[in-house]
Amino acid sequence: MRALVKFLGVTLLALLVAAYIGVGLSRISFNVDILRLLPTHLKQVEGLSLFLKNFALPDELIVTIDAAEPEQAKAAADAIAIALQGRPDLVKMAVAEAPWDNNPANLSPFLTFVLLNQPPEKIREIAKQLAPDQAAYTLQETLEELNSSVSPIKVAMLTYDPFRIFSSLMDSALSGLSGTSEFSSKDGTFRVVYVQATAPFPDYQKTATWIKDIKALCNEAISGSGVELGFTGEPAFVAEISTDMQGDMMTSAPITLALISLIFWICYGRFLPLLGLLLMLQLIFLLTLGTAGLALNELTIAGVGFASVMIGLSVDYGYFIYQSSLTHSGTTRSLQWNSLQSIVWTAGTTAAAFFALNFSSLPGLSQLGNMVGIGVCIGALVMLGLYAPLVLKFRKPLAAPKTSRLDAVVTSDRFARVGMWITLGMVVFLLGSLVFKGLPDSDFSAATFRPRKSESHAALSKLYNRFRDDRGFLSLIVSGKNESEVWERLNRAEDALQAAKSNGTARHFLSPLPLWPELTHQKANLAEIKTLSLQSPRLKSSLLDNGFTEEAFALASAVFAQTETWGNHPLPIWPTDQASSWILRRLARHDEGNYLALGIVEPSPGCESALVASIQGEGVHLVSWGTLGDQLKQTLPREILHVSLALLAGILLILLVALRSIRAVLLFTITTSLVLLCLAGAMSLLGMQWGFFNLAAVLLLLGTGTDYSILILLAFKRSGDATQAQKQFASVIFLCCTSSMAGFATLGLASNMGLAALGQTCALGLLIDGMISLFILPHACQWFLKKI
């Protein structure tokens, strides 16, 4: 009966655990927004978040077409647009040319909107140009300029605007539409098709499937034409990065498990204990991932890296228990009790290190810390509660204890002696490198967040190279609770930008102020333009008398008609036609409670920081990925230092309680400092750079690599013999160090460059930490703790 109850209890527990894991896994999604990794209080992060949320166009894919001849590129663009428009189940709109290219009159609602937003005095100036005594003079000026101008843009504009109603706006509202095209390069051999999805994407899997379908349709449409296609834009980035993140998580854990299996087999050559260890690690991984799904809902780029790190750390407790079981002759409970102290102290400091990342203002690191910290705690419990009983059951009755194959090597005097000299040589060499080469360089640019290989970024770079390259420009983002608040802030920003242009910190800027409605302006200008529209017969007759055709009056006539249409429209007016929507989609947002305007500023070289400081204010952001990198370079090292010092203080307090020796704590501090200095020297020697991700390696090393020092110090406290302490934990430190290095080294293969840098830095740091702790610290203990 007791056996049946026990069986039912175990079965019920297994079902509950499976349900818990299943529910958690079903809730996981990926967030590829790199700004989710960064401090939200930074103005650059806040401004770029507004930009990505409102102007990144998550449903718009950009298809680039590169051909040898302009005609070939045009034909391919048209063929792709037609093919995609034939699939309304996938595509809402495929645009291969500007909506006003074939008929400039399509611009009339937008041009009317721009006129309505001008200061009333400007509209009165235009009215004077059209007065009976000035109209003919204005037309003669236009004819002279048409005959002498070498600018095709100006000629085209004056041909449709002989009364110069809109030409005066070329330097402001329309300057962003002149000189360049967002559909074709100047030579016509590079073109772009903008593709909008039928509906928003619910998740990254649907995005990836949609991208795959669009690629197939595009390739079929231009089959055999010899043109080269590229795909970029927000959907392409989301699909690419999310797929890479999923692949990283699904491949890093198995590779880590394979490396751990190899290490275990080389050391012990036992199949059943290895199988049990792998099952425990998979259970720990699933429990941690399920917990993350319930608690976090979505994983960032940093969170994806937790799997290999957590497995590499949790296996340490399994190694320790198995190594202890080889010479254990008591019960399961006594094995658990004997292992408890070392595991609690090492797991406690490791978990504390990762949980301490919550004191940082970096959400990405906080998520990584929480996931690994939870995993380490779960790992310690699973190894003590489940693996310890298993390893004793796997041991054959009456068989002689079987030690590790490496015990004879790693516990030998020769191994300790050679290891000490090699480690001393390494320390001297790395410290010398640090002295002569200096500290490693730093790189906090957006490039460190990107995938190693990215088709979408390659397509975007080609687009920048063939069109206007505005990557050095700053985005002006102005937000407010309503139109009036945004308009007031835009005015202040424009005054500040004019001052910046005068003092040389800004070269040029495109302000969205002429595109932003102001109620009193629109009301006054509607009345003024209505008055002008009543003079249409006179204006048209004057135009014909001066040698222009009726077609030259079509645009002005359409504007006058649009003014009549908007006569009784509630103010402020926003146009809703296709051409206006196309232009404003990247310049303005006016949803209820979400009002934003976007402009562009070209800074003078080297003046970016000063310009940002002079313009930025409440509701006004001047941002770019470059200025974000500069801000991170200033704030992150200081923040990491503060968190590291707080974490180190916590670890020292724990050690003071455990060791009850100020000298031992001081020795631990010296050892940790030496490890970090050697790591800096190694990075400088190898040309590695500090960045957002691998700065966090300092925190991770404080929680992972310090375990090796703690084990030696605890063993020395118990025995008082440094040689015995070294031999007791030589195998354990070797196994723990190699397995943790395997976890981080696997992370070094990640598709994301920043995450890979974190893995490489931590693996290098663990190697240095393990060698110093195993080969130098015991001698330091013998000398420092006995003689001082």
Sequence positions of predicted segments:
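Transmembrane alpha-helices and their membrane-interface boundaries in multi-pass membrane transporters
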Residues: L294, M310-L326, L340, V344-F359, ...
